[in-house]
Design a protein with these regions (language model features):
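Short, well-ordered alpha-helical microsegments
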Residues: 56-60, 168-169
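Short glycine-rich phosphate-binding loop at a beta-alpha junction
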Residues: 46-54
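Acidic, divalent-metal-coordinating active-site segment for phosphoryl/phosphodiester hydrolysis
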Residues: 125-138
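PRPP-dependent phosphoribosyltransferase catalytic core
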Residues: 5-6, 139-190
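Active-site-facing substrate-recognition patch
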Residues: 1-45, 102-110
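Short, glycine/charge-rich flexible loops or terminal/linker lids adjacent to PRPP-binding catalytic cores
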Residues: 70-122
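Structural motif
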Residues: 47-48, 120-122, 159
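Short Gly/Thr/Asp-enriched flexible loops that form oxyanion-binding sites at enzyme active sites
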Residues: 58-67, 137-139
Length: 190
């Protein structure tokens, strides 16, 4: 299916010089959305998905319902994720339009399904532009170890999956040293 036709573009949003790729039209067509979620699930190498808010949630949560994923680990903006002492991990990221912080919980990682001797994760996000968000989160996750049923498991992001990759931006080059990259739709910025 040619998903590219469903995308909408907004120049100079959210700031001048950034061209926004809008994926919301996928939510307005049930058959298209279902097909897209199935295609995303088919390329995810892990049963555990890590997804930054909020659009990443839109495409990964249905995978839980359908049994195509075991767990979705949310990565949230500041003030959006309740936590216990020592549970919250802060990640510094470089976005296309500035620096930011995002957060995830170690307890969410401990709810993942181990495969062999690791906790494998697929990183999913809607857009790959510069790769700053993806790189920051994956570098942080790959350094973690969680205990499940008394056994320690290292966390390893096995792959990146993106709905849309902007091919003329350096995103892929900036992250592919950490894990293989799959993108369902390829566009150019201009």
């Amino acid at each position: 299916m040619d998903y590219k036709q469903a995308l909408k573009y907004y120049p100079d949003f959210p700031i001048k010089g950034v061209n926004f790729v809008d994926i919301i039209p996928f939510l307005q067509d049930k058959a298209l959305f279902r097909s897209l979620v199935d295609d995303i699930a088919a390329v995810c190498a892990s049963p555990n998905i890590v997804a930054p808010e909020a659009r990443g949630f839109l495409f990964t949560a249905p995978m839980l319902y359908s049994g195509q994923a075991e767990n979705v680990i949310p990565v949230r903006k500041k003030g959006k994720l309740p936590f216990s002492e020592g549970d919250l991990v802060t990640v510094e990221i470089q976005k296309e339009y500035g620096k930011d912080q995002v957060f995830y919980r170690l307890s969410d990682l401990a709810s993942c399904k181990p495969v062999g001797d690791i906790i494998p994760l697929t990183f999913f996000d809607d857009i790959l532009a510069t790769g700053g968000t993806a790189r920051g989160i994956v570098e942080s996750l790959n350094g973690k170890t969680v205990t499940i049923d008394g056994k320690q498991y290292p966390v390893k992001v096995t792959d990146y999956v993106f709905l849309v990759e902007i091919d003329d931006l350096p995103g892929r080059r900036n992250i592919e040293d950490l894990a293989p990259v799959t993108s369902l739709i390829h566009v150019t910025e201009n």
